[in-house]
């Protein structure tokens, strides 16, 4: 991968990583039912894709809410719409088109009908681990667009970070210290029951 491409991809991820008060307020401002919300950037198919993918990656358990219950898809839509520049939005849109075409080879089929197994197969086949060779990137190292694997990994990273930084998860699931003034030296298991601290 060329340095320029690596820097471009790092820039996309770094924009999300630098959590500023405006990003936090954007995350906290994402409210509403995941079924009835109207996205600002995402198309209806992209909304379905992000919503299903988020719940497959972070499903509801007995002790934790699912990604859609803490409005992760709404945050991703708002982040792409308000933070990414026009060029990055176009690159993201092209990546969505490509990945949805893989998930739904028949363009006339309804994406709502895609099963959890189809999503999992997409992830198994196309979301490569660090160090694995990306055949799309190898075939065209000069391409300015994200490969399917790069896009799925960036979406995964965004889903996890939006989930961890949501108010519900930060205050009620992770160890929460609203005024972290004291210094604690000890075993994490002993101090927080094994939970990491929220931001």
Say what each PLM segment does.
Residues 1-17:
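N-terminal secretory signal peptides and thylakoid transit peptides that target proteins
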Residues 15, 41-45, 68:
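Short, contiguous, pocket-lining structural segments
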Residues 64, 71-199:
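Mature-region segments of soluble proteins
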């Amino acid at each position: 991968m060329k340095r320029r491409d690596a820097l471009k991809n790092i820039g996309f991820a770094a924009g999300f990583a630098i959590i500023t008060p405006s990003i936090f307020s954007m995350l906290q401002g994402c409210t509403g039912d995941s079924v009835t919300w109207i996205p600002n950037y995402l198309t209806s198919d992209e909304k379905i894709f992000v919503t299903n993918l988020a719940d497959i990656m972070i499903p509801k358990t007995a002790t934790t809410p699912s990604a859609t219950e803490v409005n992760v898809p709404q945050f991703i839509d708002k982040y792409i719409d308000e933070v990414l520049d026009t060029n990055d939005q176009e690159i993201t849109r092209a990546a969505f088109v490509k990945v949805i075409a893989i998930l739904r080879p028949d363009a006339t089929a309804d994406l709502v009908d895609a099963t959890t197994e189809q999503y999992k197969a997409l992830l198994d086949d196309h979301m490569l681990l660090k160090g694995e060779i990306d055949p799309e990137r190898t075939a065209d190292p000069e391409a300015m667009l994200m490969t399917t694997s790069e896009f799925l990994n960036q979406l995964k990273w965004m889903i996890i970070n939006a989930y961890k930084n949501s108010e519900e998860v930060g205050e009620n699931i992770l160890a929460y210290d609203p005024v972290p003034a004291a210094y604690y030296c000890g075993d994490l298991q002993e101090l927080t029951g094994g939970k990491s601290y929220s931001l």
